Amino acid sequence: MKAICVNFGPQHPAAHGVLRLILQLNGEVVEKMDIHIGLLHRGSEKLMETKPYLQSMPYFDRLDYVSMMVQEHAYCLAIEALLNTTNYTANFVLVRTMFDELTRILNHMLAIACHALDIGSMSSIFWAFEEREKIMEFYERVCGRRMHAAFYRPNEVNLNFLSVKLLTDILEFNNNCLTTLSEMHNILTYNKIWKQRLVNIGSISYKDCLDFGLTGVMARSTGIKRDLRMDAFDTYANYYYLNFRSYTGQAGDSYDRFLIRMNEMSESINIISQAIFKLTTSKNTCSPASILKALNKKKFISQTYKNEYSSMEKLITHFKYWSEGFKIQSNWTYQAVESPKGEFGVTLVSDGSNKPYRCKVRSPAYHHLQVLPKMSKGHLLADLSALIGTIDIVFGEIDR
């Protein structure tokens, strides 16, 4: 049979963005694949070199625009490492941990729902998007924006709108989300058609993970026990002091990756509940006034006063801080976080000015996309949509 070449995307609904694949097919079996990326390139890393450190923060929301706050966290950790002000126990770190896990649920809900929709199950997308809408509302309540939050800041988060009512609502969301997860388990996990479409499809080995630099769910599905949140040396935020577990698979196939994502959402709910308990029972209350008082003692934090607009000198100081930003002495650092897709890292090089000399982003989805030709070889064209869904790619962070 003569091999034929087919374009898959970039307009295909299962391409999850602007992905263009040139496929060589033998009948309906994929023999070769050529991936074309770069259709969403905006030069984000170069633009960061032209802005003060704080003003580069919103660029990270626009990389992987499904897991926004986790990427802000990586950038904040990089700046804090350069300033030598890394903190693991403060209240604002607990708030970051809580919103990181809310973001993880946000990402996995979309990944699983769209994956199911690609294969033909419509029910789960309605349940998942209802839960995502609630998380978007929490985003909006703390920072005014639903997607591009710009909520985290070096050595602090915007605590002005954090309230006991918000924490109560998040706890209520946790209970409802567990019900939704059990409904999704019932309709997908034990579904015969779903298992036939995923089991032994797109299997990868331990060696493939090392060769292609796979991290996160992709690596854990093969049995690699690597989770930055639980790593004794690479841990960050408040995860070291929390009680949770990380899940691994054995087969390295699409079904294992689906199960890991489902279980991770349950663990995220557990972590959020622990973070809220710590916030509400700690000696330092969670009121913005008391936290601002503690923050003002730090050297690299904006001095926030009630009367900063009543004094000329304080107004000038306030204006200079937010327009010029702080200067960081020459140094470099690499800081990574466990994003929903894998290890999201930021390499930051400072040269003594108020702008980064270089900011390099390590996006996990870029590495995961490279393994797609090997995963899809020998599979049917119909399985390709299942494979693209299971590697969970977003082109904002691939093309940057």
From Swiss-Prot:
Q: Record's GO cellular component, any one? A: mitochondrion
Q: What class of enzyme is it?
A: translocase
Q: Which UniProt keywords apply?
A: Electron transport, Mitochondrion, NAD, Oxidoreductase, Respiratory chain, Translocase, Transport, Ubiquinone
Enumerate the SUPFAM superfamilies for this protein: HydB/Nqo4-like
GO molecular function annotations of the record: NAD binding; NADH dehydrogenase (ubiquinone) activity; quinone binding
**PROSITE patterns named in the record:** COMPLEX1_49K
UniProt superkingdom: Eukaryota
Reactions catalysed:
a ubiquinone + NADH + 5 H(+)(in) = a ubiquinol + NAD(+) + 4 H(+)(out)
Q: Which Pfam families match?
A: Complex1_49kDa
What is the documented function of this protein? Core subunit of the mitochondrial membrane respiratory chain NADH dehydrogenase (Complex I) that is believed to belong to the minimal assembly required for catalysis. Complex I functions in the transfer of electrons from NADH to the respiratory chain. The immediate electron acceptor for the enzyme is believed to be ubiquinone. Component of the iron-sulfur (IP) fragment of the enzyme. Component of the iron-sulfur (IP) fragment of the enzyme.
The record's similarity note reads: Belongs to the complex I 49 kDa subunit family.
Q: What is the name of this protein?
A: NADH-ubiquinone oxidoreductase 49 kDa subunit
- The organism encoding this protein is Paramecium tetraurelia
Q: What high-level taxonomic lineage is stated for the organism? A: Eukaryota, Sar, Alveolata, Ciliophora, Intramacronucleata
